[in-house]
Amino acid sequence: MKNINPSQTAAWKALQQHFEQMKDVTISSLFAKDDQRFNRFSATFDDQMLVDFSKNRITSETLEKLQDLAKETDLAGAIKSMFSGEKINRTEDRAVLHIALRNRSNTPIVVDGKDVMPEVNAVLAKMKQFCDRVISGDWKGYTGKAITDVVNIGIGGSDLGPYMVTEALRPYKNHLNMHFVSNVDGTHIAEALKPLNPETTLFLVASKTFTTQETMTNAHSARDWFLSAAGDPAHVAKHFAALSTNAKAVGEFGIDTNNMFEFWDWVGGRYSLWSAIGLSIALSVGFEHFEQLLSGAHAMDKHFAETPAEKNLPVLLALIGIWYNNFFGAETEAILPYDQYMHRFPAYFQQGNMESNGKYVDRNGHPVDYQTGPIIWGEPGTNGQHAFYQLIHQGTKLIPCDFIAPAISHNPLSDHHAKLLSNFFAQTEALAFGKSLEDVEAEFAAAGKTPEQVAHVAPFKVFEGNRPTNSILLREITPFSLGALIALYEHKIFTQGVILNIYTFDQWGVELGKQLANRILPELADDQEVTSHDSSTNALINRFKNWR
């Protein structure tokens, strides 16, 4: 993978000049000039997904110049490097192979001279066997009862992905009830345990090292809760499984290492739902549906690896994002799913994007002179319309938005879905085209308002429009289409990291806070005044001690 400063390329300089031509061009004028604009700026994937990027402040020339940037920064070479098992996470000396976890073609993928696929397939087979036993009721707890509830204990990638997917695929859920605990705040585990029966509860402890502070604190509290009812520590083996690589620590905890599901250093946390970390998904929806999730992601992997940049969906979305972030100065992107089951999708890719590309140092170790990762946020529609869309429509910030919706609802109640989708279509139209002062004045006049009344209110009713959006319309949210959608965003993030010359797959920014917390924790053990920090931190710690 080459280390090329994008801002020093000819393509970047051409984009800067092109931006001067484009900065005042409106989306409405682009549509007025081209009645084929939708056809030119949209694409379908596998007859399951339509991506419409026509309501953006771009022309064919914009995309050509952005694709020149991808060529100059050797995106094609970087894609080959990732798929071939090269150690592109150089700060940790690791390959990046979440694509191997869903490699349904089973073609060899080699790391350090060894094909990883036999081990991947062995873990999948072990997961299937485990899921079949638990779901069928063959797996019994310490009193001989079948499992009814599963608690996934993890944090970050070991929580956000499985929680997001199990929520998104709730229509496929079986009889098992899924619970997710992540926060080290004792309230989270305490509230999760309140309705549960120790005789019928299975815990999944998800920690690669089996040392993650938050996860192991919660796991020990869960074990204490369980043993307060079960008594015999030998019973732990029937109610706890581990998603880890530390067999020694897993065994010492009381878990049978036969019920330890491994993954590898080349699986990054925020890309790990496809691995053993996804065991909670497989338990929730059944292993066959988990395999369909993998198949959907694999189909998008093939599209990403094999499709030319000008038709490559992750690449196109990535380039458009760079255009806004680095040339228009847009600092945030909103992800707005019009599907209640997808309510955790924005939070999942908030982590996926911000932890991956929230870097200020390039791959040469130098501070960058351009923008890297944007701030990602969002809520399901139509809730967001009654919360923050006001600012998107009429505020002073440019906020590119991704609107996501299924054509087919899993809950076709009355006309709910038609009303939901009418809002989906209306919002992107309103954001793009707005409402002029002339239209507002004519509307008021037709309603019989006096000129004075019109003049008093009209300016506040104007919508400038020219707010960019992508619309991603799925046929239906299925395991396959969800897998493809997640992989689409994963590869968008990777593409942006390549072009922006940063390391996408490490996360050193999470380390300093953890180090300082480990230093502060012993200081909280007694009531002595703390003086070892700055005046603010000392005062906060001492007030906490005084009040607790």
Swiss-Prot record:
EC number: 5.3.1.9
Keywords, alphabetical: Cytoplasm, Gluconeogenesis, Glycolysis, Isomerase
Alphabetized SUPFAM superfamilies for the sequence: SIS domain (SSF53697)
One BP term from GO: gluconeogenesis
CDD domains attached to this UniProt entry: SIS_PGI_1, SIS_PGI_2
Gene3D superfamilies: 1.10.1390.10, Glucose-6-phosphate isomerase like protein, domain 1 (3.40.50.10490)
Predominant localisation class: cytoplasm
Subcellular location field: Cytoplasm
Top-level taxonomic group: Bacteria
Catalytic activity as recorded in UniProt: alpha-D-glucose 6-phosphate = beta-D-fructose 6-phosphate
A molecular-function term among this protein's GO annotations: carbohydrate derivative binding
InterPro entries per record: G6P_Isomerase, G6P_Isomerase_C, Phosphoglucose_isomerase_CS, SIS_dom_sf, SIS_PGI_1, SIS_PGI_2
Coiled coil segments of this chain: none
Residues the record marks as active site: 355, 386, 514
Pathway: Carbohydrate biosynthesis; gluconeogenesis; Carbohydrate degradation; glycolysis; D-glyceraldehyde 3-phosphate and glycerone phosphate from D-glucose: step 2/4
A GO CC term attached to the entry: cytosol
The family this protein is said to belong to: Belongs to the GPI family.
PANTHER family: GLUCOSE-6-PHOSPHATE ISOMERASE
Function as written in the Swiss-Prot or TrEMBL entry: Catalyzes the reversible isomerization of glucose-6-phosphate to fructose-6-phosphate.
HAMAP family with a match to the protein in the record: G6P_isomerase (MF_00473)
Stated name of the protein: Glucose-6-phosphate isomerase
Lineage: Bacteria, Pseudomonadati, Pseudomonadota, Gammaproteobacteria, Enterobacterales
Gene: pgi
